[in-house]
């Protein structure tokens, strides 16, 4: 068996850059199979504002991937038993891949990692396109093309099932293949902490940055930094994580959440709402009632409770270190290890 990784384009400041380096090695070690990466080449580093990719460039990238896949079929390189892993399941080329395999009589398997789509009202597709028939039918068709549909959280599976049909036999809740993160931030652990609170998310409506900005005005004794406003390198970003006591979220969209995990790895307290994927992933010590930040109006009503919670975290920081360690261990095992993913691919 050859495992073909149909990858998502890499953005230097996103985990997609690390997947380029680590995923092929991890997959090969776990399966002992030949691993081939199908890349679309270089891609614009300037993402569409508020998004994690470039809406034009991503289609150029996917088209180049499809050309390579088609050429390999024409040259007879794709064989029975081969496995195609799409690291972003929202990739229409999977339909053409299934088309070629079926018509040419090549018995392959296909898996895809779902990140978001129109079925999430807070995603770009959900906000701008919504439940337009073309996008819902496209997503259902892509889902059906995959033998294995991988989701990182039960919340994401439930969200998907609210708008689209789910087949439990081809739907898997697995950790994302990010075990490389566990030790990659070791050099930033143990840094001197300062009264720093970070907003590590994209600047997008569903991240509710206005709440963070308002908190800055009401808690002048602490330093508040919006990371994406700083044009940070990965090293500079991780330095801030290492110095921060708290990572704050009021997100309205989250199907996994990597930044709060990275923060916890270097002993930054995650303060997250009890909603979305956070509900199943976060320990009770780090969750606050969802109503506090369900929207800006509710935030204003509960501002006193939010600020009181932040002050407790900041002033009693060391009391939470044991719980942070428990949180990290849980996330390492259940959400940021690809072992179950590799097992599904290996059959």
Q: What residue ranges belong to the model's regions?
A:
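A charged, aromatic-enriched C-terminal amphipathic alpha-helix characteristic of glycosyltransferases
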Residues: 293-347
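Membrane-proximal helix-turn-helix segments that form the acceptor-binding/catalytic region
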Residues: 128-149
């Amino acid at each position: 068996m050859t495992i073909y990784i149909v990858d998502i384009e890499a953005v230097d400041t996103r985990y997609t850059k690390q997947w380029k380096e680590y995923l092929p090695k991890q997959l090969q070690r776990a399966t002992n199979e030949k691993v081939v990466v199908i890349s679309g080449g270089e891609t614009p580093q300037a993402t569409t504002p508020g998004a994690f990719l470039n809406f034009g460039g991503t289609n150029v990238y996917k088209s180049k991937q499809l050309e390579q896949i088609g050429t390999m079929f024409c040259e007879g390189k794709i064989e029975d038993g081969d496995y195609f892993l799409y690291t972003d399941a929202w990739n229409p080329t999977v339909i053409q891949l299934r088309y070629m395999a079926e018509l040419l009589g090549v018995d392959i398997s296909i898996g895809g990692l779902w990140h978001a789509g129109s079925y999430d009202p807070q995603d770009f597709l959900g906000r701008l396109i919504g439940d337009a028939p073309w996008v819902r039918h496209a997503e259902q068709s892509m889902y059906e093309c995959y033998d294995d549909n991988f989701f990182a959280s039960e919340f994401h599976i439930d969200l998907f099932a609210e708008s689209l049909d789910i087949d439990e036999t081809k739907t898997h809740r697995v950790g994302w293949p990010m075990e490389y993160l566990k030790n990659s931030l070791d050099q930033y652990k143990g840094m001197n902490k300062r009264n720093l609170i970070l907003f590590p998310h994209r600047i997008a409506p569903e991240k509710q940055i206005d709440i963070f900005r308002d908190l800055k005005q009401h808690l002048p004794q602490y330093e508040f930094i919006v990371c994406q406003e700083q044009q940070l390198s990965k090293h500079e970003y991780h330095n801030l994580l290492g110095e921060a006591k708290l990572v704050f979220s009021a997100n309205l969209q989250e199907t996994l959440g990597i930044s709060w995990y990275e923060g916890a790895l270097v002993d930054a307290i995650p303060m997250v709402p009890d909603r979305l994927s956070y509900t199943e992933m976060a320990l009770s010590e780090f969750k606050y009632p969802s109503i506090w930040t369900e929207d800006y109006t509710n935030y204003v009503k509960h501002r006193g409770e939010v600020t009181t919670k932040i002050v407790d975290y900041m002033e009693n920081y060391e009391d939470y270190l044991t719980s942070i360690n428990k949180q990290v261990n849980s996330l390492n095992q259940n959400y940021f290890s690809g072992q179950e993913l590799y097992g599904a691919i290996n059959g």
